[in-house]
């Protein structure tokens, strides 16, 4: 046991970032409520960062903060602010200023090392039954394969890929451990939310031409992409 009552340690977390393009509280509140209604289990009471790089003009920071509280979200801080006077306003309002990480400087090449032995093959968790609303299935360190339908309100999580050979109506979160090479495959994509390594789409962000169709999702340049599943 430590002899001190607290310890400060560095850590990192994946947070959703809300990019604002309108400063009116009622407009923001309505938009937030619509998003939360689409995926309440994922967004309700979620911690979020607000990026204000797309806003012009004055902002009532206290009202903005209250808008997020009223919507059931926890505002961690503000990002995307480059103006010193604006930063001072944000600080006076009692809000934290966050700075996005910058790419690290190139490092000198290290001498070649002995190759590590190949990693063990990724395991697979197989689910042969329908996944019903309220169920949550997690495949740690493995792919997840579901050979039946997934109901709205159900949640699939895998550190590897997710395959659904049926209608996918719930939430599918692949690459949950941070694997950006993970993919999602569905023979009928109708999901409430899809996510790969923390990058997600809500249902209204899935391109209409792929909704209720066989589709494959993956990351390209850090963004979600979708293509037909042939």
From Swiss-Prot:
Keywords: Cell cycle, Cell division, Septation. GO terms for biological process: cell morphogenesis; division septum assembly; regulation of cell division; regulation of cell septum assembly. Pfam families: MinC_C, MinC_N. The lineage of its organism: Bacteria, Pseudomonadati, Pseudomonadota, Gammaproteobacteria, Enterobacterales. This is Probable septum site-determining protein MinC. The keyword Cell cycle applies. Gene3D superfamilies: 2.160.20.70, 3.30.70.260. The keyword Cell division applies. It comes from the Bacteria. Cell division inhibitor that blocks the formation of polar Z ring septums. Rapidly oscillates between the poles of the cell to destabilize FtsZ filaments that have formed before they mature into polar Z rings. Prevents FtsZ polymerization. It comes from Cronobacter sakazakii (strain ATCC BAA-894). Interacts with MinD and FtsZ. NCBIfam families: minC (TIGR01222). Belongs to the MinC family.
